[in-house]
Amino acid sequence: MSLPESPHSPATLDYALEDPHQGQRSREKSKATEVMADMFDGRLEPIVFPPPRLPEEGVAPQDPADGGHTFHILVDAGRSHGAIKAGQEVTPPPAEGLEAASASLTTDGSLKNGFPGEETHGLGGEKALETCGAGRSESEVIAEGKAEDVKPEECAMFSAPVDEKPGGEEMDVAEENRAIDEVNREAGPGPGPGPLNVGLHLNPLESIQLELDSVNAEADRALLQVERRFGQIHEYYLEQRNDIIRNIPGFWVTAFRHHPQLSAMIRGQDAEMLSYLTNLEVKELRHPRTGCKFKFFFQRNPYFRNKLIVKVYEVRSFGQVVSFSTLIMWRRGHGPQSFIHRNRHVICSFFTWFSDHSLPESDRIAQIIKEDLWSNPLQYYLLGEDAHRARRRLVREPVEIPRPFGFQCG
């Protein structure tokens, strides 16, 4: 099967007649083309591409019917092979656009410019046949065709730019944006408060709060253990103190009457009833912060039948404090003195504090007894004793009178 040959111009035919070697090489290449066609079993199909236009010359492409040159590229239906121009050259397929097409330039341009390029392109065709027969890849064939058949000047003439540069306005806008970014980067954050990422700050804040809660809980447990440990030692010394106070008659009534705040409540009948008080105990409840308990131990007396009167204060939910006490069983003809008139002021009596839980000063009285009187009753008991002792010690000391000058010894 033979490929159709493109028509030659008269200049090309004259050149072939003048050079016998050139005609022989053309016949050899025609035979090689027929051999290649027989090898491919008719699978090659000719595709005609118009010749590329030279932008420098400004010449319109010629029609093949008018004697112009036509590029013939053989395309295999199964795989790609190098293109063979009938009688002149072998060129690679136009896989790379204008650059690949520039590599298949014929010798006509060279002849017009006075350069005998037929021999060079003939050798390139033979090399292309050899590479196709050896089973080399299409990219290698294209590379060799570019290196041997095409000059750098011709490649530059037919090559077209792939990436278009932005226009003048686009370049100005890009440079302006780049300058603004650089100025903002150098200036840094402004003085005003920026947008706050609340979630970014809440997460570490929550973790810190959890750590604080854990530390507080651990401190409470440690404090409770310390209170229990030293509470046992404290109870031991309190028992010894109570044993001694029981043997001192009128100890607690004296301490109450000498206290600067509680003494106003103890007048008349209350003082007589407190004279039968033998012991006072103040104890914390099971949990120290939930309340306390007051225990008053009495001897047999003509006023009431109780030997133990208890008043309890409890701290319940939401910080509410409630109190309740033992019901006092009064003897016939006796009862609590509700109020005491002193200096035009009405003051509740001490035993009213046991029965009336609605008094405004009830909690204040309990706090004074717990934190001041009971913690150190000796200091208030000794106030009366020290004053009595101070009055007894008050003695007039003699005053030394100086003698006259004449009676002095020489």
Curated annotation (Swiss-Prot):
GO molecular function: chromatin binding; histone binding
UniProt KW Phosphoprotein keyword: yes
Species of the source: Homo sapiens
Family according to the record: Belongs to the nucleosome assembly protein (NAP) family.
Keywords: Phosphoprotein
Chain positions found as Phosphoserine: S9
Residue segments, region Disordered: 1-31, 46-69
InterPro entries (alphabetical): NAP-like_sf, NAP_family
Listed name of the protein: Testis-specific Y-encoded-like protein 6
Record-level GO BP terms: nucleosome assembly
Top-level taxonomy: Eukaryota, Metazoa, Chordata, Craniata, Vertebrata
Gene field: TSPYL6
